[in-house]
Design a protein with these regions (language model features):
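Catalytic beta/alpha-barrel core
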Residues: 18, 37-42, 107-117, 129-143
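Glycine-enriched alpha-helix->loop->beta-strand junction motifs that scaffold or abut catalytic
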Residues: 31-34, 57-58, 127-134, 152-159
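Active-site groove signature of glycoside hydrolases
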Residues: 94-114, 195
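Alpha-helical scaffold elements lining the catalytic groove of polysaccharide deacetylases
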Residues: 75-98, 115-120, 149-187
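Hydrophobic faces of well-ordered beta-strands that scaffold small-molecule active sites
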Residues: 11-15, 35-37, 58-64, 106-108, ...
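Active-site beta->alpha N-cap acidic-glycine motif
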Residues: 6-72
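C-terminal domain-boundary segment and adjacent tail
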Residues: 128-138, 142, 198-249
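Terminal interaction modules at protein C-ends
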Residues: 1-9, 176-180, 217-220, 224-227
Length: 249
């Protein structure tokens, strides 16, 4: 049983990694439209799924592939890496943004290596700043990330992930536990953000639990609205002090 929260308890949920499976992506799109969806921009089904997501009223993000610590040599299409030249780095991001003009913001896919490097994060924020209104979400795939801090230096609206819903992607009980952890955090600080993926277990649990949350005093909002609310609730919010359950990628 989840205890009721005050009306000020706001949560936001991102389902990212969309684009490689059409069927799983379509199931994610059937979630309540307050759930924000983030597509891998060079994946085979990204364009089709993004169009369907927008049609169903979801806010759309781009899930930017970035180099990781755990597998630094594995570069999927469009991965931003330490050895990417500044010009190529910015051109790649510009291409993604041009291909998905409805995107309202970006978050990092993997990136436990790249998000530690201020120069590369500065290139990212400089590019985002050219597109007024875009926000950045630090997925916090490492506790050493400085990405959100750099976003703040460039006045990019930003926030950070608090909870990963599905570190155990096939375990429904684990997803429920993580969602309850998100709700507890939202009660404690007034707001909390989770990232999940289009795994069958995750989709099933969210379909079961999300419709009940309004009656328990929680408000589910898209990420753009979440950032606005967070700034009002916590004018001195520091992403580095955000509670996290980090998972290295």
């Amino acid at each position: 049983m989840i205890a009721a929260a005050s009306p000020a308890a706001v949560i936001s949920i991102i389902i990212d990694d969309l684009g490689y499976s059409s069927s799983l992506g379509k199931k994610a799109i059937q979630l309540p439209n307050a759930v924000t969806l983030s597509v891998l921009p060079d994946s085979p089904h990204a364009l089709t799924l993004s169009q369907q997501a927008i049609k169903h009223g979801h806010e759309l993000m781009l899930h930017l592939p970035m180099q990781s610590v755990s597998n630094p040599d594995r570069h999927e299409a469009g991965t931003l890496a330490l050895d990417t030249l500044e010009s190529d780095f910015k051109i790649t991001i510009q291409r993604f943004l041009e291909n998905f003009p409805a995107a309202t913001g970006v978050n990092n896919h993997m990136g436990s290596l790249l998000t530690q490097h201020p120069g590369h994060m500065a290139w990212l924020m400089q590019t985002l700043a050219e597109h007024k209104g875009l926000y950045f979400v630090d997925s916090r795939t490492t506790d050493k990330t400085i990405a959100a801090t750099i976003a703040g230096e460039y006045a990019i609206p930003h926030t950070s992930r608090n909870v990963f819903l599905d570190n155990k992607p096939r375990d429904e009980a684990h997803v429920r536990l993580q969602l309850k952890r998100l709700l507890r955090l939202a009660r404690q600080q007034g707001h909390a953000l989770a990232i999940g993926h289009p795994h069958p277990a995750t989709i099933k649990v969210l379909k079961q639990m999300l419709p009940r949350l309004a009656a328990q005093g929680y408000e589910i909002v898209p990420v753009s609205r979440y950032i606005q609310i967070q700034e009002k609730m916590s004018p001195h919010f520091s992403p580095q002090r955000s509670q996290t359950l980090s998972m290295v990628h």
